[in-house]
Amino acid sequence: MAMQQFDNQISVTQINPAEHYSPAPLKKTSSLNHENVASDAKIVLATINAKYIHASLGLRYLYANLKELQSCCEIKEFVIQTRAIDIVEQILEAKPDIVGFGVYIWNIIETTNVVSLLKVVAPEIKIVLGGPEVSYEAEQQDIVASADFVLTGAADISFYQLCKDIINKTEPEQKILKSTPVELKDLELPYQYYSDEDLKNRLLYVEASRGCPFKCEFCLSSLDTASNPFELELFLDQMDILYQRGARNFKFIDRTFNLNIATTMQIMQFFLDRMTDDLFLHFEVVPDHLPRKLKELLTLFPDGSLQFEVGIQTFNPEVQTNISRKQNNPKSKENLIWLKDNTSAHIHADLIFGLPGETFETFRESFNELYQCRPHEIQLGILKRLKGSPIIRHTETFDLRFNPLPPFNILSTDRVDFATMQLINRFARYWDMIGNSGRFKHSLAHILSDNPFDEFMALTNWLFEKTGQTHQINLKRLYELVSQAVEALFPEKHALIISIIELDYAASKLKSHFGTLHLYAGEQTKSSGQNKLAQRQQRHKL
């Protein structure tokens, strides 16, 4: 990833890495050669995914570009819920000499625990870290203190070079190594290393381009200088191989998929020509760049085949200027409405709360404007401090205060106090359960009217006061709570909502009958009897 040249006035803590890393020459006395590498060393590539359905594209790129070392390498993927000690056990089963970890904001805590344990149990193993979470401000991180090497930036090639040096006993003296920029034409593509199990059960991440020309300061892609495409014919050949093997779920990680319309059209036509009932494509699109010819093509895709992730973030021009975001707001709204009315694409639109200059009131306006565009989902994100992102240049000016622990979310600004930030966090969580889940697709539109933000905020406050929780609410109980909240907050709507919410409840396919729900606040839920501890004690007496 290209480095951003910052102004001297910008307060950014950067690491001081060595010059671009190049491999040391092989020692003349070394017995290493391409034929005996596999018997001389063992490499494990590992990462901790947020969910099982996520397959690591980054690890597969590293594996694809290991050349003669590939035969002695193994990929091991884990999920967040796995205990660190169990991950260490599974890694050690491979008897590795080198372990490379992909480190991201969602797995930094868990990976730190694994690396710490691994260094205690098997200190002789060389641990190499890479990924966005350790590519910046690395020297201040606990995980780096435990590791042997850190490769910053795109490590597709530099990981191979470092492994050769470690195996050959010519490893560099520096711990933090800056990867040489990668020419995409020099990369071996990784798609053949998706297994049949991956194709059957997991999301397949693919990329037709790398980088982003936009400079939105909350995003690490703002450090890129441009969006660089892979050779299109080669990329489509790889997609065809995946398709012929049975792949039907493709998630493009391109930051700006519709930047080059000619390329976008060819990729879309490629998949349209192979359309089946189970083919599903996921793209991140620029909201104000949908020319007529692309629109015409999009109308040809059947229901259930497309999902568009549309980054709006904010409609406030002042905030957009603060974060260097260029967006034609009227055109973005027009295109969102057009997509909803004229295509079968599932539209997932993003807003971010806590941006420099944003207030409760301006965020309310952005939410209401986006709601009127009628996307299927509105993802309400809370600003996070991604290491290396230019957003931190605003820290003093806007008194940005971030959580020191992952996920490094914003806690307050000069415009938004901590209590308000917590309020929006609850709003976002309830919106995800009620608005984005699709569980209330019939009734929610009737609960909210001309002022959806304030009405849903009232619902948020009522639900939290009633339950004191934003997680682990039983679905049947959630239907009851929403009905009771409407009775308390909007009594004139309650009779209508009861009749409509029955449609939502039926769609949920819960086993209990709708007539058994407590839809009125005055109804008392029957006691569940003994609490769990008493039940446990009672079993020992039987």
Give, region by region, the residue ranges found by the protein language model:
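Residue-level signal for the nucleotide or nucleotide-sugar donor/cofactor binding architecture
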Residues: 82, 154, 230, 259-262, ...
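Radical SAM [4Fe-4S] cluster-binding motif and immediate context
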Residues: 188-341, 345
